[in-house]
Amino acid sequence: MGKLEAAISPKTKLMLINTPHNPTGKVFTRAELECVADILRRHPHVIAVTDEVYEKLVFDGREHVRLASMPDMWERTITISSSGKTFSCTGWKVGWVYGAAHLVRAVTLANQWIVFCICTPAQRAIATILKEADEPYMGFPDYYAYVRSHYEKKRDDLAESLKLANIKPIVPEGGFFIMADTSKYEVPEKYVQQPGPTGESPVTRDWAFARWLTVEGGITPIPPSAFYQPETAHNAANLARFAYCKEEATLVEAKARFRKLGSSLH
């Protein structure tokens, strides 16, 4: 927390907080967010913008805590959420922002220059399902309990599949993705030298690994250096992000491919 506070200057306008976090799956605890709130209280010129699009997808009995719910934070927090993650319809770009009136007004004024038009049928559909999601569903007390259980199992299944390939999963506390350690593999040089998406060559190891695994293993991860600042991207060299928001048949096939990949190391 000391490094976080040290990064604040008189020119700082906002602090962006993402929980559950993408790509790591970290869910910030109440105690951790209280520390963040304390920092913000000491710097009244800074507002908080919280990305909480995975708020309903927290696992192992964890609690999703909203920074805006803490003392003195409502007036200083813009909360962002989304229907696409919660209801497994990521192509429906329908989300919402809420907070104190003066903050929402500023968002509204900016938004009119960002979004040309909206998809009213999708908005009406999401408004309806938000009401129905609190009702009992598939033997669970509500839809949210069902979807948590559903994705928690997918997470566990993919984590076990990764282990078959000697890829060490960093088991997420929430969200759609598993970050994993791929350092057991030596990536062929040709995948390092092939130009990257913007023509750069050589590419970073995580890009080369993602390419190699796609071509040779039939499995495509995301190279996580895309989530880093250039000066810290080296920390992602031995990492890859895998998604478990997939149909069961896809995860079963992936398991078979991971098993085959693991056997190649022996």
Q: What role is predicted for each listed range?
A:
Residues 1-266:
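PLP-dependent class I/II
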